[in-house]
């Protein structure tokens, strides 16, 4: 096999008159008798090959080529005739007149075409993932991911960070999701856990004096899957010592700025906008707001305390909220049926319903209009609602109102075409609550993780009013997605123990699970903090994809299985015996 001169997709006018050797896959063959055209594909794109009757043996061999045959060709690059130029191809101004052809491998009939825009099922594409990855859009998505990691390495290496690996086999600790457990053959009955994050280890590296750490960390969480989640994922993981929260955020911005410059050729302005958690919830109904469009939530609670609309007044006077969004020019676009569908949809957030009115000729119309007649002028003024606008109301508890209106503003903004899809809007959400109440557990849990440092002024609230305490934490948001986040960490043993107790973790439990971390705090643990950026999600957004599976070479499906290798799978009884394990037989359900 000859050495390749260049990639097929890079052959342009600068190669005219040169002899090149190319390797790749046959995308398409077109035969015109004594002339055969072949599109040769590799990761950089396509180039047109020409086989003519100057070499009858090669022409005959070219006639046997089929889609996805792997070939090697050598030939002269020439400019195409003006009429033959293809403006849709990067290499559309040139072609290669082939003088040598070698078939390196053949291909059977394919389960689907190797091209973009196919309608093949996701399961089939995952079963033949190696073929799916040949499609140009998938190649570009994976390449985009590689470019992001290269840019991140570049920034971190140039700014004094040390690339240090942490263990993938560690002990099981509660971090929110279920652990993936690995049985130990050497210690029967004992298990390792795959890390949900390198959190404790990277903090211990700070105690060891490696004040600027990073790695492309592999993380594992046994949780229910959504479109932007996988059981195994990668994060750009960073930890530093002796930095303020603002200085740490500057490092995260530096990584993102480098990535945007190198990968997207966009210079994003820094520092990024900062918004407190409470403001984000009040204005956008979300702790990860998409700020590319307005449709901000407006509070009508005080006004509605005196409303004759009993649903609103009762809600407002019971300590709950009445809030609304105005959809500009939405009155004519949305029918009652369409709005009823959205009313039904937000019930999944706990909402009892959604009221709506339309502004027509300066007056309110619609089902709720008659109940708001007395306050019509005041309401129109407060909302700055104009003719043709649609107003949506939700009255309920804080979280229900936020979740419902947060969803509605995104839904209607996208449906109305109000979102600039070409924009990358970065935002820091800061000043988070330290705890959040988990209805399922019936207790307070850490909003981020139990190592997050409280605001200095809130430490004493750990024992008295934990729900009032705020954290020195920060999330980085991109276009309504949580791209990553971090915090300053607790570095004093007494505060860490108080944090554990506030979470309902007994001294016996936290000593058993985190004794090594607490012990380290007795030996001069420095102030420290850090962050992690989700590489998969970052790549998904920069590649313009809707699912992180598209930027992972070999992902799991929505059932956490992998159709290509049929993982997970049963193992041989001898392997179970060696590990001292016994699998209970499946019981058929009635």
Swiss-Prot record:
Its EC number is 6.1.1.12. One of its GO terms (cellular component) is cytoplasm. Pfam families: GAD, tRNA-synt_2, tRNA_anti-codon. It is an enzyme of class 6 (ligase). Its main location: cytoplasm. L-aspartate binds at residues 175, 221, 448, 489. It catalyses: tRNA(Asp) + L-aspartate + ATP = L-aspartyl-tRNA(Asp) + AMP + diphosphate. InterPro entries: Aa-tRNA-synt_II, aa-tRNA-synth_II, aa-tRNA-synth_II/BPL/LPL, Asp-tRNA-ligase_1, Asp-tRNA-ligase_1_N, Asp/Asn-tRNA-synth_IIb, AspRS_core, GAD-like_sf. The keyword ATP-binding applies. Catalyzes the attachment of L-aspartate to tRNA(Asp) in a two-step reaction: L-aspartate is first activated by ATP to form Asp-AMP and then transferred to the acceptor end of tRNA(Asp). Homodimer. This is Aspartate--tRNA ligase. It comes from Latilactobacillus sakei subsp. sakei (strain 23K).
């Amino acid at each position: 096999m000859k050495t390749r001169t260049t990639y097929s997709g890079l052959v342009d006018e600068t190669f005219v008159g040169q002899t090149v050797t190319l390797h790749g896959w046959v995308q398409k063959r077109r035969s015109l008798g004594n002339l055969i055209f072949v599109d040769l594909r590799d990761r950089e794109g396509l180039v047109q090959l020409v086989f003519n009757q100057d070499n009858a043996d090669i022409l005959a061999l070219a006639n046997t080529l089929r889609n996805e045959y792997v070939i090697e060709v050598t030939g002269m690059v020439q400019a195409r005739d003006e009429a033959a130029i293809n403006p849709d191809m990067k290499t559309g101004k040139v072609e290669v007149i082939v003088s040598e052809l070698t078939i390196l491998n053949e291909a059977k009939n394919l389960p689907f075409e190797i091209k973009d825009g196919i309608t093949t099922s996701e399961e089939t594409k995952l079963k033949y993932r190696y073929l799916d990855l040949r499609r140009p859009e998938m190649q570009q998505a994976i390449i985009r991911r590689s470019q992001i990691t290269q840019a991140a390495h570049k920034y971190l290496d140039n700014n004094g960070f040390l690339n240090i690996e942490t263990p993938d086999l560690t002990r099981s600790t509660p971090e929110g999701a279920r652990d993936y457990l690995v049985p130990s053959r050497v210690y029967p009955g004992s298990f390792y856990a795959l890390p949900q994050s390198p959190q404790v280890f990277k903090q211990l590296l700070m105690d060891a004096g490696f004040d600027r750490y990073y790695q492309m960390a592999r993380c594992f969480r046994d949780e229910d899957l959504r479109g932007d989640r996988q059981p195994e994922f990668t994060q750009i993981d960073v930890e530093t010592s002796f930095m303020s929260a603002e200085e740490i955020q500057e490092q995260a911005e530096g990584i993102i700025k480098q990535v945007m410059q190198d990968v997207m050729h966009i210079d994003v302005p820094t520092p990024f906008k900062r918004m407190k958690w409470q403001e984000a919830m009040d204005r956008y109904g979300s702790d990860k707001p998409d700020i590319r469009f307005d449709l901000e939530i407006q509070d009508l609670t005080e006004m509605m305390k005196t409303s004759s609309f009993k649903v609103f007044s009762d809600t407002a006077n019971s300590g709950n909220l009445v809030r609304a969004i105005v959809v500009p020019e939405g009155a004519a676009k949305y029918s009652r049926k369409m709005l009823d569908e959205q009313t039904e949809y937000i019930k999944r957030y706990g909402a009892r319903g959604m009221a709506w009115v339309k502004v027509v000729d300066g007056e309110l119309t619609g089902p709720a209009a008659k109940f708001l007649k007395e306050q019509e002028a005041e309401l129109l003024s407060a909302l700055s609602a104009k003719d043709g606008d649609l107003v949506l109301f939700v009255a309920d508890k804080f979280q229900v109102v936020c979740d419902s209106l947060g969803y509605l503003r995104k839904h209607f903004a996208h449906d109305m075409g109000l979102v600039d899809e070409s924009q990358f809007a970065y935002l820091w959400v800061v000043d988070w609550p330290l705890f959040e109440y988990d209805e399922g557990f019936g207790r307070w849990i850490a909003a981020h993780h139990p190592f997050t440092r409280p605001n200095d002024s809130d430490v004493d609230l750990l024992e008295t009013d934990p729900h009032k305490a705020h954290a020195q934490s920060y999330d980085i948001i991109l276009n309504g997605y949580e791209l990553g986040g971090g915090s300053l960490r607790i570095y004093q043993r007494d505060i860490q123990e108080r944090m554990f107790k506030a979470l309902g973790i007994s001294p016996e439990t936290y000593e058993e699970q985190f004794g090594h971390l607490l012990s380290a705090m007795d030996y001069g643990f420095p102030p420290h903090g850090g962050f992690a950026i989700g590489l998969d999600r970052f790549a998904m957004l920069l590649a313009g994809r809707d699912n992180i599976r598209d930027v992972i070479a070999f992902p799991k499906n929505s059932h956490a299985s992998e159709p290509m290798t049929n993982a997970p799978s049963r193992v041989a009884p001898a392997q179970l015996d060696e590990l001292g394990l016994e699998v209970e037989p499946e019981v058929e359900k009635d």
